[in-house]
């Protein structure tokens, strides 16, 4: 046990009291992202070190690892606390998404350290999908780069509203206020094109030296703002899902014996209470909530983000992938939607292709009807393309094999987020965020069946010399 943790437990009056205090702290999930070698892993290592979250054996191991793999000369290489893969240590880069946990007296934190290299952008999107705040690192010597713009856009696309622009390595530019101001203005010019109402803050720091990370820097008297840790401890996070209508995707039908039948899952948004009238989609059958069962016993009500099991008063047909919502809410099932896609496979996404998709516990198939545009990350302009390449981001039209109940991703990430799965390899090849569900009334009927369209795409891809025409036409 490290000395800081031991002191906290002693101050709280014992382990049990300390654990209760931890449960009542708010939790902030954030990620670090930016271009390669901007110091993301070093920053996380510095946060863990300066908040005294490192155990003595870890510190001893870090001294030894710094001698073998370190890139900071005689100094401790704090990035090694996070870069766990052997390939990462040998190359001095981050490849996988690394998660770390730490806490202070004010708040608990879960950190996702994401890769900076462009070829690992898909890993970065994975890390951002569960976060509420993004720390965007910028090398003070290089300024705003393409990968900085890419990560900023992906973060906002995935619903992150709080951006902290950490201008790192200020020690290498002599802690220049002019450099900080120039980069700040450059980023704000770019950020004006980002979607949504964003909370953007700027902190000049040196992760290697510890300036403005957990304590105020004496080398930058011109900066009077908060340190990075103070920003993380005080930022107010308003969860969108709390104010949204009730959504409960069924993940598992729990029937341990003949006397109990419950529907387990995580409440995606809103709240549910005993006695509430609920409706099951897509069947439309209604019932009342008889019990809300949790690990700690029965509850009278539950809120977004809580894992619960609902018991209904009636025995009705409900299976994995069904959605429960308030009975008085009208939410029609749709068979088409426009989806913002981050593509993660070497094989490009092309019109006519079909994939398995998973959304809120539901698994079905979807066909790509067309690609409206791909976003140019450098200037956020939209351009027409025939396919979406690896790490490409664009708006895609999908048609599903069966009606689905969808929300816009910005309203509800659970019922609006989906993944694409290759049907042969079973590998996840893309992430999608529902931009707009297309109602049945406005969806244009297809002249051809899903099988005919898929066969047509297969023939055109593998036998182009046959000259088969595109059945999708101008779609």
Swiss-Prot record:
Heterodimer composed of CysD, the smaller subunit, and CysN. InterPro entries: CysN_GTP-bd, CysN_II, CysN_NoDQ_III, G_TR_CS, GTP-eEF1A_C, P-loop_NTPase, Small_GTP-bd, SO4_adenylTrfase_lsu. Residues 92-96 are annotated as: G2. Transmembrane segments: none annotated. Residues 168-171 are annotated as: G4. One of its GO terms (biological process) is hydrogen sulfide biosynthetic process. One of its GO terms (cellular component) is sulfate adenylyltransferase complex (ATP). It comes from Escherichia coli (strain K12). The keyword Nucleotidyltransferase applies. It is an enzyme of class 2 (transferase). One of its GO terms (molecular function) is GTP binding. The lineage of its organism: Bacteria, Pseudomonadati, Pseudomonadota, Gammaproteobacteria, Enterobacterales. This is Sulfate adenylyltransferase subunit 1. Its EC number is 2.7.7.4.
């Amino acid at each position: 046990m490290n000395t800081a943790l031991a002191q906290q437990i002693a101050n709280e009056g014992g382990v049990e009291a300390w654990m209760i205090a931890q449960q009542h702290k708010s939790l902030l999930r954030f990620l670090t992202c930016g271009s390669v070698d901007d110091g993301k892993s070093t920053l996380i290592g510095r946060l863990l070190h300066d908040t005294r979250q490192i155990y003595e054996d870890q510190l001893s191991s870090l001294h030894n690892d710094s001698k073998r793999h370190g890139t900071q000369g005689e100094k401790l290489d704090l990035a090694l606390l996070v870069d766990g893969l052997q390939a990462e240590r040998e190359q001095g880069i981050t490849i996988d998404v690394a998660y770390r946990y730490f806490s202070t007296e004010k708040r608990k934190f879960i950190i996702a350290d994401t890769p900076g290299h462009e070829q690992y952008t898909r890993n970065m999107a994975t890390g951002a999908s569960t976060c509420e705040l993004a720390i965007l690192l910028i090398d003070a010597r290089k300024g705003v780069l393409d990968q900085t713009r890419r990560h900023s856009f992906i973060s906002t696309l995935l619903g992150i509203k709080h951006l902290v622009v950490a201008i790192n390595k200020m020690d290498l530019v002599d802690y220049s206020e002019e450099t900080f101001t120039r980069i700040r203005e450059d980023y704000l010019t770019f950020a004006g094109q980002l979607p949504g109402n964003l909370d953007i803050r700027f902190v000049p720091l040196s992760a290697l030296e510890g300036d403005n990370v957990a304590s105020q820097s004496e080398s930058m008297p011109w900066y009077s703002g908060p340190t990075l840790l103070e920003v993380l401890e005080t930022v107010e996070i308003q969860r969108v899902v709390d104010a949204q209508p009730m959504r409960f995707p069924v993940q598992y039908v729990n029937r341990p014996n003949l006397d109990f039948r419950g529907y387990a899952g995580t409440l995606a948004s809103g709240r549910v209470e005993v006695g509430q009238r609920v409706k099951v989609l897509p069947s439309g059958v209604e019932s009342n909530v008889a019990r809300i069962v949790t690990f700690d016993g029965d509850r009278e009500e539950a809120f977004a983000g809580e894992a619960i099991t609902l018991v209904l008063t009636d025995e009705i047909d409900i299976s994995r992938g069904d959605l429960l919502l308030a009975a008085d809410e009208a939410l029609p099932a749709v068979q088409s939607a426009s989806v913002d896609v981050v593509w993660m496979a070497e094989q490009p996404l092309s019109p006519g292709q079909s994939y398995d998709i998973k959304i809120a516990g539901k698994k079905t198939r979807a066909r790509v009807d067309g690609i409206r545009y791909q976003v140019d990350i450098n200037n956020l302009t939209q351009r027409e393309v025939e396919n979406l390449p690896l790490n490409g981001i664009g708006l895609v039209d999908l048609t599903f094999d069966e009606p689905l109940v969808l929300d816009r991703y910005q309203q509800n990430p659970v019922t609006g987020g989906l993944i694409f799965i290759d049907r042969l390899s079973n590998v996840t090849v893309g992430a999608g965020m529902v931009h707009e569900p297309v109602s049945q009334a406005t969806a244009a009927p297809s002249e051809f069946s899903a099988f005919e369209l898929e066969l047509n795409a297969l023939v055109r891809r593998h036998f182009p010399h046959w000259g088969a025409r595109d059945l999708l036409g101008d779609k």
